[in-house]
Structures are given as C-alpha cells and as structure tokens.
C-alpha cells in the first residue's frame, strides 16, 4: 500500500472512529459516567491492518477530535485514550507476531483482560481524585468498572473479528488468516 493510500486510510478510519464515538450510551444506570461507544473498532481494524502503532494513533486522533468537538471532560477523555491505546496496541502487537485467526482471537482476549485490569488500576487512582471522594466510592463502583470494561472490549473484539476479514478483503490487504492479497 502506498504512503498516500495509508495516510488516506488512516484519515478515513480516524474520522469514522470519531463519528461513532458520538454513539455513546451508559450500560449501567448506577454508573452512568461509564459510556460505551464503538470507536475502538475502527482503530483495532487499523491496528490489525497497518500495525499497533498506527492503530494507537487512530485512538489518539479520535479522542482529541472528540474532546475538541464535544467533551468538556479532559480526565475522562484521557482515560479513554490511554485504555483504548492499550487495548488496540496489545491486540495489534500480538496479532502481528503471527497473523492468523487464532492469534487475532488471542490478541483480543489478552488485550481485553489487560485493558480491563488497567482500567481498574486507573480508576482506583482517578475516582477518588476526580470526584474528590473517598476510596470507598471507587470500591462501590468497582463491579461496574470491571463489568463495563469486559463488556466494552468484548463487544469491540467480537465485532472486529467478524468485520475485519470483510474490510481487509475489500481493501485487498492482509486477511486474518495472514494471506497477502497485495502480492
């Protein structure tokens, strides 16, 4: 793929990720600040196609654009960026070591578990500071944070798994099985 095509592809997927980030909704009414959006899906596709660094770049671009357009919450958007980059980066890194369907699944599972554990740790630090609340508030939200992140990254993984092959075939790039269509 030429440099111009890669730049165009990254731009299109960054814009797509930004747009779908507006489709946010809370999963748990008791923790309405935890909002699901499917914006890591385009970034994960890019990570599988072009590498983990490029996928992480898409996450960063979409979070900056979303912050500038809608979010007045720098802490929430920063956490979203850090967690999204860890998820997309780890999944892409594992996949690129041995491009296969099994490795893609393994990468997404490991990335989901890592990003969820990372979210729990970040929230343990941020919730008491951001909400100026005691650590007990974090403990109250712990089950929701755990479940939310498993669901979020799980949905992103499942959708990516089923969409990636079609997208890569359309673009005539590498498929999940590792075959190269670009000679």
UniProtKB/Swiss-Prot annotation:
Keyword terms of this UniProt record:
Cell inner membrane, Cell membrane, Membrane, Transmembrane, Transmembrane helix, Transport
Disulfide feature: none
**Family listed:** Belongs to the prokaryotic riboflavin transporter (P-RFT) (TC 2.A.87) family.
Function of the molecule: Substrate-binding (S) component of an energy-coupling factor (ECF) ABC-transporter complex. Mediates riboflavin uptake, may also transport FMN and roseoflavin. Probably a riboflavin-binding protein that interacts with the energy-coupling factor (ECF) ABC-transporter complex. Unlike classic ABC transporters this ECF transporter provides the energy necessary to transport a number of different substrates. The substrates themselves are bound by transmembrane, not extracytoplasmic soluble proteins.
Whom does it interact with, and what assembly results?
Forms a stable energy-coupling factor (ECF) transporter complex composed of 2 membrane-embedded substrate-binding proteins (S component, RibU, BioY), 2 ATP-binding proteins (A component) and 2 transmembrane proteins (T component) upon coexpression in E.coli. A stable subcomplex with both A and T components are also isolated. This complex interacts with at least 2 substrate-specific components, BioY and RibU.
The protein here is known as: Riboflavin transporter RibU
GO MF terms on file? riboflavin transmembrane transporter activity
Give a Gene Ontology cellular component term annotated to this protein. Answer: plasma membrane
Q: Which gene encodes it?
A: ribU
Report the principal subcellular site. membrane
**Pfam families, sorted:** ECF_trnsprt
Q: Which GO terms describe its biological process?
A: riboflavin transport
Location of this chain's protein in the cell: Cell inner membrane
Instruction: Write down the Gene3D superfamilies for this protein, in alphabetical order.
Output: 1.10.1760.20
Taxonomic superkingdom = Bacteria
Membrane-traversing stretches: 9-29, 41-61, 75-95, 109-129, 144-164
Q: How does it sit in the membrane?
A: Multi-pass membrane protein
């Amino acid at each position: 793929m030429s440099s111009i095509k890669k730049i165009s592809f990254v731009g299109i997927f960054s814009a797509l990720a930004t747009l779908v980030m507006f489709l946010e909704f809370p999963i748990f009414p008791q923790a309405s600040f935890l909002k699901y959006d499917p914006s890591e899906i385009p970034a994960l596709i890019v990570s599988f196609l072009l590498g983990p660094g490029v996928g992480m770049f898409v996450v960063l671009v979409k979070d900056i654009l979303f912050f500038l357009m809608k979010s007045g919450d720098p802490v929430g958007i920063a956490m979203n960026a850090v967690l999204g980059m860890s998820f997309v980066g780890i999944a892409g890194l594992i996949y690129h070591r041995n491009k296969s369907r099994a490795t893609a699944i393994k990468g997404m599972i490991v990335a989901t578990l890592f990003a969820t554990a990372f979210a729990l740790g970040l929230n343990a630090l941020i919730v008491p500071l951001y909400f100026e609340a005691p650590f007990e508030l974090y403990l109250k939200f712990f089950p929701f944070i755990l479940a939310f992140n498993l669901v979020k990254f799980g949905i992103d993984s499942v959708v990516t798994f089923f969409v990636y092959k079609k997208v890569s075939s359309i673009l005539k790039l590498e498929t999940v099985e590792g075959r190269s269509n670009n000679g």
